[in-house]
């Protein structure tokens, strides 16, 4: 790795002969400075000084086609921290590994929900929700889905991701037989 340029928010690195812009990922509402994530879903470990592979999980769609997704384990070490429903818990003196989907890490880092309305919501509507309806915004932020436009869960490039409602996500999946 060759560090080309670095400022407070973005880091440009030369990885495998390509200049790749990276940022510290936002996971579970916090910025993690031990990793960097690119727009294409590559994750760099600052402590190991290398790209990390992540864990590949497999599932089957309705047509028995194998669908592979990539997850990364991150270390969480805050006092009295509780997870977001996954059952992970941190108590004093222990560190827990949490798993985060690569597509969620890319979207939350490069296209934060606050600045990028979900598909089907206009900017004008989104500004009203953010400003005047915090309970609606919180509900949306907890229930919104991230969809892979090309239906390939291993393709975590920002250009292949979009936020959709659970209803739209289920409709699209049924329509495509996934």
Where do the PLM segments sit?
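Conserved recognition-core residues within compact binding domains
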Residues: 2-145, 152-178
């Amino acid at each position: 790795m060759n560090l080309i340029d670095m400022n407070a928010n973005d880091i440009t690195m030369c990885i495998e002969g390509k200049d790749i812009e990276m940022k510290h990922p936002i996971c579970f509402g916090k910025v993690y400075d031990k990793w960097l994530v690119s727009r294409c879903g590559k994750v760099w470990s600052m402590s190991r000084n290398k790209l990390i592979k992540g864990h590949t999980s497999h599932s089957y769609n309705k047509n028995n086609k194998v669908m592979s997704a990539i997850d990364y384990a991150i270390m969480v070490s805050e006092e009295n921290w509780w997870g977001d429903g996954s059952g992970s818990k941190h108590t004093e003196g222990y560190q827990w590994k949490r798993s985060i989907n690569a597509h969620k890490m890319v979207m939350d880092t490069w296209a934060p929900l606050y600045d990028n309305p979900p598909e089907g919501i206009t900017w004008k509507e989104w500004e009203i929700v953010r400003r005047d309806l915090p309970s609606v915004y919180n509900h949306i932020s907890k229930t919104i889905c991230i969809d892979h436009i090309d239906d390939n869960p291993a393709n975590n490039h920002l250009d292949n991701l979009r936020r959709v409602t659970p209803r739209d996500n289920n409709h699209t999946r049924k329509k495509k037989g996934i």
